Amino acid sequence: MARGFFITLEGVEGSGKTTQAATLADALRNEGRAVIVTHEPGDTRAGEAIRKIFLDPEISLDIASELLLVLADRAQHVREKLRPGVEAGNVVISDRYSDSTVAYQGYGRGFDLPLLRQLNQLATAGMIPDLTIVLDCPAEVGIARTRERVKGKPHKFDRFESEMLEFHRRVREGFLAAAKEEPERVKIIDSQQSYETVTAEILAAVHQLIEARCR
């Protein structure tokens, strides 16, 4: 069986990646492709337990503890869902993956980047996305979108939604840096464009990936 594709969507809070991941999956299924949509943290049984601690703003975590939690989640995710899904020939779409760890814990929290990358390599077991789409917008825009989305609804802001604006600006810098470091893998799309335009640009990037494999 031919190997599938591993695609990740990344971005700051409120960038629209979760919505676009679902839209991309629908578009690819309409083309007759087998698709799995997943997310980090929390899309395994162990991950669900980790996610509760990881995102709870009332639990004080040392930066190393925070990092190791998300990496434990990733190790389970790779073993249980990501690698089996791709090896079975699916297009696997993950809402967040390793670039989020570099952006949030590395750039946002200031954890040592070389060490973080080494630990991330252990968690991923060398599984690298075929394509990463970063939905980019200023941190101010993303936070405003997040607050507008939950306006009038019962919502408890998680550990990262509760962070100060400067933290989210550093996180954005981390995602932009990833695109500069690995331009072949990481593509930036302006998420301030219309929903339809963003959708079209994501699908075009994915089609380019698939067509390149077929050449």
Where do the PLM segments sit?
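Conserved lysine of the Walker
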Residues: K17
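A glycine- and Lys/Arg-enriched "phosphate-lid" helix/loop adjacent to the NTP-binding pocket
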Residues: T101-E173
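Hydrophobic positions on the alpha1 helix immediately C-terminal to the Walker A/P-loop
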Residues: Q20
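Extreme N-terminal, non-catalytic leader segments
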Residues: M1-F5
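Hydrophobic anchor at the beta1->P-loop junction of P-loop NTPases
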Residues: L9
